[in-house]
C-alpha cells in the first residue's frame, strides 16, 4: 500500500490471528477508519465500513448458530443473549484485548476523541477484521475467530445477568429488596451539542447506587443501572 510499512500488520495476523494474509490489503483496510481516508485522499482510497458491514453479518450468523445449536431456550432469551454478546462494549473489549488499536489508521482528531468514541472505533474494526477473515479464509475460520474472542464471554454474561435489560433488571431487584423504584438523575452534562457527555446517577431512596457516563442519557442510564446491579450483587442479592 503506497510504500507503507506493512510488516506490523502481517505480524499481527501471524501472532494474533494464527495465519498470514495472502491479500494483506484486506486486513489493512479493515483497520482503516473513514477519517484517515478523508485526511489522505490522494494516497488512501478505502476505509473499513464495507468490511464492517460484511463482518457484522458474519458475526451475527456465527453467534446465532452457536446459541441455536447449544441451547434450547426460546427465541426471546436467545435474542437477548446474542445482543449482549455483540453489543459495542463486548466487541470493543475483544478488540482492545487483541491489541490492534495502535494499528488502526485514523485522523488526528479521532485519536484525541472520547473514550466512548474510541471504543466504537475498536468495535467497528473488530467487525471489519471478521469481514476480512471471511474473505481471506472463509466462514469456518471466521467462526473460529468469533468463538475464541466473543462466544468465550457467554458464561460471564449469563452469570452476571448482564444480558437482561439493565434498567428492568435493576427495578426488579430494588423493588424486591428495598420496595422502591430506582430514580435516574442527571449529575452533569458536558461538551458541545454534537458531542455531549452525560453523567447520570441512579438512586434508590436517598442512596446513589450507581453512576453512568455516555453520549446520551439513555446510554448513561444503562451504565448506571449496571453499576447498581453490580453493587446489589456484591451484597449478595440476585
Give a label for each model feature:
Residues 1-238:
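Double-stranded RNA-binding/processing signature
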